[in-house]
């Protein structure tokens, strides 16, 4: 009986040491996860900051273009009035030609942007995925952390985990508005589609440059390799009344 109690005591000590070791490993893992979470959050905030700056710059450019267009329109209007007062000997046909030409210029300038924005909006729920394969691993909005209880993160877009080095493609035709880098998080491409803008980040290589015209499903870059897999971060923004608004990409994407 004494020997049995000694054996039980030894076993209890082993179990106790094992539990303490497991607890230490668990604490260490939690610390590592917390550190990784902080780093991921830092990258998200840096991405958000740079995307906000890029979109704000695009909004300011659009405002300036509209101001310039209005100035040009006013200048032509004043020139037309001056021409009427100083050259009233012109024939009716010549006056009609001037009016027709002016009307054509105004129509060409005002129709392009609205047509592009309207087409993008009409494709809600039918846009192709930004990658050819993959699974959504973090959705738009607030997400609970998979291992840390009570911890959640906020996502301005969606994260799609896919094959290592996968190509990223434009979900709609448009023009490249910005290309920039995030330290430790690859490169970012922003494409404007009229009143909408799409964001593609975590890129290793970029195949387009600012001002480039892109077509539907055109490759814009390849993803960073993250231990045998890659993750594509994708966002959609709507510019309304000069203010940006994030949209849920899952509601816009359809088939691949």
Predicted segments with their positions:
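Alpha-helical oligomerization segments with coiled-coil/rod-like character
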Residues: 1-94
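Terminal peptide-recognition signature
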Residues: 26, 136, 160, 174, ...
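Long, low-complexity, acidic/serine-threonine-proline-glutamine-glycine-rich intrinsically disordered tracts
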Residues: 67-132, 138, 142
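Short glycine/threonine/proline-enriched tight-turn/helix- or strand-capping micro-motif at secondary-structure
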Residues: 105-124, 137-170, 193, 231, ...
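Residue-level recognition of beta-strand microenvironments
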Residues: 139, 179-180, 223
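Zn2+-dependent peptidoglycan hydrolase active-site motif and core
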Residues: 153, 170-205
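Conserved, short, structured surface segments that act as functional micro-motifs
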Residues: 189-192, 210-256
